[in-house]
Swiss-Prot record:
GO terms for cellular component: cytosol. Keywords: Aminoacyl-tRNA synthetase, ATP-binding, Cytoplasm, Ligase, Nucleotide-binding, Protein biosynthesis. It is found in: Cytoplasm. It comes from Bacillus cytotoxicus (strain DSM 22905 / CIP 110041 / 391-98 / NVH 391-98). HAMAP family: Pro_tRNA_synth_type1. The gene is proS. Consists of three domains: the N-terminal catalytic domain, the editing domain and the C-terminal anticodon-binding domain. This is Proline--tRNA ligase. The keyword Disulfide bond does not apply.
Length: 566
């Protein structure tokens, strides 16, 4: 393709609202433009990268036995109401009404639609297993869209759904698609980890996320420093054991702590370690209020709280709700004196605290010499805290370290979560009616483009891996007014295309500095510069990833480039 025909408006300055490298460079290189907050147009070069990623996905999905279809983005509310998610999914679901006052949603995901489709067609075990996938636009009303394509309100996603008669069949397909995902991200050139994850609003149980390692990732990965264990920090269990000291229990005492509210402030004021404090928080678990206790140097993991109760929604209670429930302010909360009808759950570490400290449920006062069971009730002990760096790895091998990650893929074993809710059944080989067993497998396609850009860049621009680069080779005649340079460049352009390479020819009459700056921004794997030595049959070849360059005879160019791109 000739560059004069490509719509690729470049920017010399970093856009003010672009916080991370991928967002900055995709805008500066003219790969995309913002239409509204969290909504982007893919320009020609960006679309070519997107299509390359889609092609890799399609190849691996079909190799894994999945068949492509396309479902509507606009979905009837009745299906979401049938599954129970119309009300539980939250404000991220974009809802609307048509002229007849019928409710719809713009699809954030397609479990309901695919289940409705399959339940009307698949009635016998003889038609199972079945795996279907689509690449479709999704919509989520993000409260704060940010980081360009990483957190938008409209995005492209590949979602696959598998249907089974047995759990063994689901396990087999899950493993196959897990491997397909590993192949996809490896072919895209990404440095990634597959980690144990939480199913969130999707439901189901066994699930893994595919995380691209990046300092700008919004997720934290907890991994072992000696084994292959890796999990989203939300899902990493704490296997530490806590032993009570043999210190004698002291008499409970109420002390004044004026203007001391945070754990750090209280522990410093009382000259004790934060680990001697009991942190008290109130959560709304579905429609029920629960008091949660953890050690002062630990943080409550709300996903673990959710899993204790099998709840759909867990959120921190508001100041007003805490005031109404416990008749005190948030900075003074403690478990002593809480009404019997209020449930209290505590992390295992709390049971080992001897002569600790907690809020007195009274502004400006705390209790010291606090001991569980003697001074307050606990309805249940459980693992309720986030794992920390330095904790023992859950697999017993090594200690935990943290890394940041961008989630680009997620696979779930949904089980019968949707089929039971929506009465999607089949007849088994004994003629008995059973709910379909389901799996779900998603890839953020546009997000993957951003993740690649985030991992592959330098101070001058993008550095695309060859598998997803919009073109393989960038041919740049320094001076288009030179008949020799123009003719050599066009001959190279034509011959490389005949060899099967995708080639971009910069046929513009811009200054050389502008051409080179744009070439660095575009980040194509190989640059061929046709300059003053063109009349000698010599050109310069530069490898974008390493910035290494060499003078090469035109007759040797095909072999030289083939060696670079092999």
């Amino acid at each position: 393709m000739k560059q004069s025909m490509v719509f690729s408006p470049t920017l010399r300055e970093v856009p003010a609202d672009a916080e991370i490298k991928s967002h900055q460079l995709l805008l500066r290189a003219g790969f995309m433009r913002q239409n509204a907050s969290g909504i982007y147009s893919f320009l020609p070069l960006g679309l070519k990268v997107l299509h390359k990623v889609e092609h890799i996905i399609r190849e691996e999905m079909e190799r894994a036995g999945a068949v492509e279809l396309l479902m509507p983005a606009l979905q009837a509310a009745e299906l979401w109401q049938e599954s129970g998610r119309w009300y539980s999914y939250g404000s991220e679901l974009m809802r609307m009404k048509d002229r007849n006052d019928r409710e719809f949603a713009l699809g954030a995901t397609h479990e309901e639609v695919i289940t409705d489709l399959v339940r009307d067609e698949i009635k016998s075990y003889k038609k199972l297993p079945l795996t279907l996938y689509q690449i479709q636009t999704k919509f989520r009303d993000e409260q704060r869209p940010r980081f360009g394509l990483l957190r938008g309100r409209e995005f492209l996603m590949k979602d696959a759904y598998s249907f089974h008669a047995t759990q063994e069949s689901l396990d087999e397909v899950y493993d196959r698609l897990f491997q397909a995902y590993s192949n996809i991200f490896a072919r895209c050139g990404l440095n990634f980890r597959a980690v144990i994850a939480d199913s969130g609003a999707m439901g189901g149980k066994d699930t893994h996320e595919f995380m691209v390692l990046s300092d700008v990732g919004e997720d934290t990965i907890a991994y072992s420093d000696t084994s292959d264990y890796a999990a989203n920090i939300e899902m990493a269990p704490v296997v530490a054991t806590y032993t009570k000291s043999d210190e004698a229990e002291k008499a409970l005492e109420k002390v004044a702590t004026p203007d001391q509210k945070a754990i750090e402030e209280v522990s410093a004021f009382l000259n004790i370690e934060p680990s001697q404090c009991i942190k008290t928080m109130v959560f709304k678990v579905d429609e029920k209020f629960v008091v949660v206790l953890v050690r002062g140097d630990h943080e409550v993991n709300d996903v673990k709280v959710k899993n204790v109760y099998g709840a759909s929604v867990v959120e921190l209670a508001s100041y007003e709700e805490v005031r109404s429930l416990l008749n005190c302010e948030v900075g003074s909360l403690g478990p002593i004196g809480i009404a019997e009808d209020v449930e209290v759950i505590a992390d295992h570490a709390v049971a080992a605290i001897v002569n600790g400290c907690c809020g007195a449920n009274e502004e400006g006062f705390h209790y010291v010499n606090v001991n569980s069971e003697r001074d307050f009730k606990v309805n249940q002990y459980a693992d309720l805290r986030f794992i920390q760096e330095g904790d023992q790895s859950p697999d017993g091998k090594g200690t935990i370290r943290f890394a940041r990650g961008i989630e680009v893929g997620h696979v779930f074993k949904l089980g019968t979560r949707y089929s039971e809710a929506m009465n999607a059944t089949f007849l088994d080989e004994n003629g008995k009616t059973k709910p379909l067993i389901m799996g779900c497998y998603g890839i953020g396609v546009s997000r993957t483009v951003a993740a690649i850009a985030e991992q592959f860049n330098d101070e001058n621009g993008l550095v695309w891996p060859k598998a997803v680069a919009p073109f393989h080779v960038h041919v740049i005649p320094v001076n288009m007014k030179s008949d020799v340079q123009r003719e050599v460049a066009e001959n190279i352009y034509t011959s490389l295309q005949e060899q099967g390479y995708e080639v971009l020819l910069d046929d513009r009459t811009e200054r050389a500095g502008v051409k080179f700056a744009d070439a660095d921004l575009f980040g194509l794997p190989v640059r061929v510069t046709v300059g003053k030595k063109a009349d000698e049959g010599i050109v310069e070849v530069k490898v974008r990833a390493t910035n290494e360059s060499a003078e090469v005879k035109v007759e040797d160019l095909h072999t030289y480039i083939a060696d670079i791109l092999k």
